[in-house]
């Protein structure tokens, strides 16, 4: 190991950290890799970070693009208060690497763990959380980006109730083709419980509204302290949505691409919409009205971020001067790249560029020059 790095073991994974950093503890493990908390012993104040080790980046092109997408979007959204901050990135050996370290803002918990806990949550908490999600989402959408994986575990929270959106690996651009729809979108999107019906039913087009559906699912989960549409499979997920929202009308069914999906829905008994006041009898009526606007089956009728921020439920927080838009559209041109080697070089270039911008410059030679 070179003199600029130290080795630690975190949850069975070797962590090779930049000198000066010490691991505090492991925070989580998933298909992407491992996350730990660490501290910079060379700095006295504000010295704790979360370090995400993304592993097996180049085992599949999809994973390589996901890593590139994540680091590019974290840089693009770096200055927003409701989006997690990227402090540094590191590649231990650019000449032969299959992993990447992201040094990010350390938060104390995620919304999923808070919902599952015994901690009392009030309507004021719900208002604050939903407002902050929408502020971050407005900024993301204004850059022509769909997050596509909003869920409680991707919402980081501190004890002071500050909330930040994380995990942009599944995000995609909005290439407008027809009306509000998108020209390009992959199937790999959003954990099923938070997935918009137009995604599940392969509507002829879909839009920013898919993220607003996820926000509605999160609001309902806050109100009930459990997932709202907890489908065990694809069909069960749809059926749970129909039981609450009622059976879709013919106008909505006609927007579905799949003939078999259309036939399935037409074969179902006609179900009425269930009033949210019966499901959440003690909830703030304004919260239920916003929920109704978010969990609207037809995406063209679903509320937008800007409209949701102006909803009476969030009036105590709403301040247009503190709800900025992104000054620059995000460029998804790299999505067209098919070569893993080209993606590898792009990751090296992004890490080197970022270090130059943030004062953490290290020399990253092009693989072609090593």
Swiss-Prot record:
Changing residue 182 to A: No change in activity. Serine-threonine protein kinase which may be involved in maintenance of cell integrity. Functionally complements SLT2 null mutant in S.cerevisiae. The modification Phosphotyrosine is found at residue 188. Changing residue 186 to A: Loss of kinase activity. The gene is MKP1. Gene3D superfamilies: Phosphorylase Kinase, domain 1, Transferase(Phosphotransferase) domain 1. One of its GO terms (biological process) is MAPK cascade. The modification Phosphothreonine is found at residue 186. It is an enzyme of class 2 (transferase). This is Mitogen-activated protein kinase 1. The active site is at residue 149. Keywords: ATP-binding, Kinase, Nucleotide-binding, Phosphoprotein, Serine/threonine-protein kinase, Transferase. SMART domains: S_TKc. Residues 21-314 form the Protein kinase domain. A motif (TXY) lies at residues 186-188. Its EC number is 2.7.11.24. The TXY motif contains the threonine and tyrosine residues whose phosphorylation activates the MAP kinases. Changing residue 184 to F: No change in activity. It catalyses: L-seryl-[protein] + ATP = O-phospho-L-seryl-[protein] + ADP + H(+); L-threonyl-[protein] + ATP = O-phospho-L-threonyl-[protein] + ADP + H(+). ATP binds at residues 27-35, 52. InterPro entries: Kinase-like_dom_sf, MAP_kinase, MAP_kinase_CS, Prot_kinase_dom, Protein_kinase_ATP_BS, Ser/Thr_kinase_AS. Dually phosphorylated on Thr-186 and Tyr-188, which activates the enzyme.
């Amino acid at each position: 190991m070179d003199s600029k790095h130290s080795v630690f073991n975190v949850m069975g994974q070797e962590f090779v950290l930049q000198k000066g950093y010490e691991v505090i503890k492991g925070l989580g493990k998933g298909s992407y890799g491992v996350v730990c908390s660490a501290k910079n012993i060379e700095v006295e104040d504000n010295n704790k970070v979360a370090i995400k080790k993304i592993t097996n980046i180049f085992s599949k092109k999809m994973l390589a693009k996901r890593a590139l997408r994540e680091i590019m979007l974290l840089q693009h959204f770096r200055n927003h208060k409701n989006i997690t901050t990227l402090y540094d990135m590191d590649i231990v050996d650019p000449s032969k690497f299959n992993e990447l370290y992201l040094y990010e803002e350390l938060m104390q918990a995620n919304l999923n763990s808070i919902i599952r806990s015994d901690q009392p949550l009030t309507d004021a908490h719900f208002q604050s959380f939903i407002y902050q999600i929408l502020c971050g989402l407005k900024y993301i959408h204004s850059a022509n980006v769909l997050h596509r994986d909003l869920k409680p575990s991707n919402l980081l929270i501190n004890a002071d109730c500050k909330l930040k959106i994380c995990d942009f690996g599944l995000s995609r651009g909005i290439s407008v083709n027809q009306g509000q729809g998108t020209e390009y979108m992959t199937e790999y999107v959003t954990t099923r419980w938070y997935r918009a019906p137009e995604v599940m039913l392969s509507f002829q087009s879909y839009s920013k509204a898919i993220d607003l559906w996820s926000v509605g699912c999160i609001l309902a989960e806050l109100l009930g302290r459990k997932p709202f549409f907890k489908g065990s499979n694809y069909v069960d997920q749809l059926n749970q949505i129909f039981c609450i929202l009622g059976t879709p009308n013919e106008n909505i069914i006609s927007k579905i691409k799949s003939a078999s999906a259309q036939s399935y829905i037409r074969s179902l008994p006609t179900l009425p919409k269930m009033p949210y006041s019966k499901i959440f009898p003690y909830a703030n009526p304004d919260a239920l009205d916003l929920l109704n606007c978010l969990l609207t089956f037809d995406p063209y009728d679903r509320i937008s971020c800007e409209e949701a921020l102006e909803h009476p439920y969030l009036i105590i927080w709403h301040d247009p001067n503190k709800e900025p838009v992104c000054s620059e559209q995000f460029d998804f041109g790299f999505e067209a790249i098919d070569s893993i080697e080209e993606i590898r070089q792009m990751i090296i270039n992004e890490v080197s560029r970022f270090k130059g911008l943030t004062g953490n410059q290290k020399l990253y030679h092009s693989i072609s020059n090593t």
